[in-house]
Amino acid sequence: MPDDGMKQAYRLARELLWDRLDDTSPGTTEILKQVHQADLIVVQGQYDHIESVLESAGMPYSVITTARLERAKLRPDQIVFINCPGLITSKTVRKLQQFVHQGGFLFTTDWALKHVLQPAFPGLVEYNQRPTADEVVRVEILDRQDGFLQSVLDAEDDPLWWLEASSYPIRILQPDKVKVLIRSKEIQERHGESPVFISFEYGQGVVYHMISHFYLQRAETRTLRQAAPSMSYVAAKGIGEQAQRKYQDLGAEEITTGQLESAFTSTVTLWGVVLRKKARDRDRKQE
């Protein structure tokens, strides 16, 4: 289970993201406010809980079981999130393949690499058969040119990512078709592959996959900066002194910069996927 510090970090990350967007990209907040419960479908899992990040971020969503997913009528304007382990039937695999081909977005984590992506989209990515230990690694965000990420992340951001024991490293089989959004040299050195977060186009839709679990249950500190109270991270994001009082009341002095930074990066990554989906649907309507 996540430690209390990470639960608090996710609550603070939501406030920080909205405050940062109000200053840098107010139009983005209006788009995000148009997300409806039926737009985001979370398939329950045993080991990951993406819905916890969605809830902390203030996103509306619907939760269904794998059995209900098999019967569900999916729309191409939706995003389907599949929590680890992603154990689904062959019928559901074909349903998801068709869903993405018609324009839907699919977001999976960890063991779903083997149980969902390999059978649904063969020949693109696979599990490299070298499971991880329970560890925290430094990650590098490669997609910083993305307009949304530019508006909320800074060059000083240096997030760490939690890997649960037996996470599945991602081997890319077709580098020309699979984009690495976040990578880790530490994972490559220890387990043979660097990708942390990837995406690829399929038909009119997009598939996203992340190693380990999206809801980070713990963090660690490696530098004095990361060990400092998270108020320093809040200030570095441009939050003024008067507005900082809100964060103090929310307990920002009780968690570290490392905890808030990891939760903020996780939250931002999720919002980025939702924004890309909204933008693509808007462009399709204008065609």
Where are these regions (language model features)?
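Extracellular ligand-binding/catalytic regions of CAZymes and related secreted enzymes
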Residues: 1-38, 55, 205-206, 212-287
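Helical hinge/lid and interdomain linker segments adjacent to catalytic or ligand-binding clefts
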Residues: 36-120
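Short, solvent-exposed loop/turn segments at secondary-structure junctions
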Residues: 47-48, 87, 113-114, 186-187, ...
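A glycine-rich, often tryptophan-bearing local segment used as a flexible ligand/cofactor-contacting loop or short
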Residues: 87-159
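Hydrophobic/aromatic beta-strand patches that form the interior of the parallel beta-sheet core
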Residues: 107, 181, 208-210
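Conserved anion/nucleotide-ligand pocket segment
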Residues: 158-166, 180
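Short, Gly/Ser/Thr-enriched beta-strand-loop segments that form substrate-interacting elements
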Residues: 175-194
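Short, surface-exposed beta-strand/loop micro-motifs that present aromatic residues
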Residues: 192-203
